[in-house]
Amino acid sequence: KWRKLDNAALAFPLVTGKDDTRVFRFYCQLKEKVDGEILQSALDQAMEKYPLFQAVLRKGLFWFYLEHRSLRAVVKQETEPPCSRLYIPDKKSLLFQVSYDKNRINFEVFHALTDGTGAMHFLQELVQNYLILAHPESNLPRIENAEEITHGDKEEDSFSQYYSSDIPKDKEKKKAAVKLKGEKLVHSDMHITEVVLSVKDIHQR
């Protein structure tokens, strides 16, 4: 089985490399240390619901496409820098990685496989599976997404569905975004800065 990349994802395989991995990370911080074996079982269950993630990226005659492969997604303890390279041309490997470190469950994914919404739903499913397996005595309820996602939704080309060149551009001058100052790091050097902010204070601004 194979499926084409959506329009927004077509450029990612062409521009990715060791200096720009096109990988993003979502994570969940628990109140307890993560058990790797239980997390693996939770991932196995999640893959049954998200079989489209069990794919490798292949290059066709004219375009890239995703090909289903019977590769097991394996949980790893975090050792690599965040958002390390996942897609390497001619290497038949899955385009995401689940890892853990102390209390944190990480989900990293190559952007051509899914967008932020798909990644968020997958991580929610993964963490829910983990908590149910880790605490059977609590009889935790299984919570389904408010909007049930079908296989068709997971394959949806949102770019084609919602983008239109006919919509007039907004000529109203908007306030410029905040620009970070200082010396830039090279892409291969990634530093993680964690900040805790008050939502109330942000809303007041």
Report each predicted region and the residues it spans:
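Non-catalytic N-terminal regions of enzymes
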Residues: 1-160, 189-191, 196, 202-204
